[in-house]
Structure formats: C-alpha cells, structure tokens
A protein has these predicted regions:
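A local structural motif
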Residues: 54, 79-106
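A bilobed periplasmic-binding-protein/Venus flytrap-type ligand-binding module shared by bacterial periplasmic
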Residues: 38-49, 151-164
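Short amphipathic alpha-helical coupling segments at ligand-binding clamshell hinges
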Residues: 54-56, 162-173
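Ligand-binding "clamshell"
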Residues: 19-31, 44-46, 118, 123, ...
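Periplasmic-binding protein-like
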Residues: 68-75, 174-194
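Short, glycine-/small- and polar/acidic-enriched structural segments
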Residues: 2-47, 95
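Short helices/loops that flank or line small-molecule/ion binding pockets
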Residues: 1-7, 22, 72-73, 93-123, ...
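A conserved helix-loop-strand patch within extracytoplasmic ligand-binding domains
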Residues: 31-80, 180
C-alpha cells in the first residue's frame, strides 16, 4: 500500500496499524472495523491456567502490538500483573508481579503453534492457531472475549479516502447479514464480525 500499488487492505488491528504508522511514517487512515480474531491461550501440558506451576514457561508473540495483547491476556487471567498505565506498549519488562516465577518467552507469532510442546502455555493469534488446526472454542484454555473484542481488524485506506463512496459501499457489504452468516459458518466462532465503527 505504501508504494501506491493498493488502495486499501484489511488485515491489521488498530494497535498494529498505529505502530506501523508511527514507525514507518505511512499515510493511511482507518476506514472501518471488520472482524476480530480473538487471541487464545493454548497448551499441550495443562487443562487450565490454574494448573501452572512455579517456574513454568509461557510464550507470547514478540511483535509490539501482539506481545502487549498476549501479556494483557495472561494478566486478565490473573497470572501476571503489568505496570499501570503501560497501555499498548507492554513488554515482559513491564511485568510487575509474577507470583509463580513464570518464564516469559517471546517468539515470532507464526512460530507459537509449532513451539506449543516446548512451553507450558502460549498466547496465540487465532489466524496462526487455525492454521495449526486449533479452535478457540474447542482448544483454548483461556481467550479474549468473542463479542466486543478489543482488537478488531480494520479496513485501511490511503490517507484522505476513508469517506469515498466506494469505501462506504464496501463497509455496507462487509457488515451485511450475508457476510455475517458466511463468517459464522466458515469460521465456527473463531472469527467474529465487528461493528463498523
């Protein structure tokens, strides 16, 4: 998109988009929210996060937006605590409470499913979990909310074009009953349609 070859794309969350704009200087606008891929915690070794033992290992994605998301997921589960006010920039250095002395391992997001047997539990993005045959509804031992997920993907356009008629039309089709039915049937709850705004 930055080269002008594309007018729009749809694959990133808002924190990821903001990080890319900040670090790479892209001139993009968020047009509308599309779908959410709720992040889940998966394990081959435990059935519940309550089963974590002292010194066990947990893994999170190592890219800026998804590491924060994974750490926040473990925090929501009551496993760790992050520094107050850290927002969308948390890394493992921002963990202020880790009562079970868990080893927090940062790995490339796409590698997390392959490394699942090497750690006690891992926070995995749904697209990579699905690619490994994992279902958030059937295999995750903890996950982000499926409805009103705080990390929807967004439809992104070149700066100054978010109110173009064609973009409004795409938004309308994206949020139609037919699209909602397709997503529900195709992804069986692992991907959920977000409200437009």
């Amino acid at each position: 998109m930055s080269s002008g070859d594309l007018d729009a794309n749809s694959y990133q969350t808002i924190p990821f988009l903001k990080d890319q704009i900040k670090n790479k200087g892209y001139k993009f606008d968020q047009a509308f929210k599309t779908v959410a891929y709720p992040m889940g915690v998966y394990s081959k070794k435990i059935k519940s996060l309550k089963d974590l033992k002292d010194g066990d290992s947990i893994a999170v994605p190592n890219d800026a937006s998804n590491e924060t998301r994974g750490l926040q997921l473990f925090e929501k589960a009551g496993i760790i605590k992050l520094k107050k006010g850290v927002g969308q920039t948390a890394t493992k250095k921002d963990v202020v409470s880790n009562p079970k002395h868990l080893k927090i391992i940062e790995l490339e997001a796409s590698q997390l499913p392959k490394q699942l047997g090497e750690v006690t539990a891992a926070a995995i993005n749904t697209n990579f979990a699905m690619g490994a045959g994992l279902s958030i509804n059937e295999n995750a031992i903890f996950h982000e909310p499926l409805k009103n997920n705080p990390y929807p993907n967004v439809f992104v356009v070149q700066s100054g074009h978010k109110n173009d008629a064609v973009i409004k039309k795409i938004d309308k089709y994206y949020h139609s009953k037919q699209t909602a039915a397709f997503i529900k049937k195709e992804f069986k709850g692992s991907v959920v349609l977000s409200s437009s705004k």
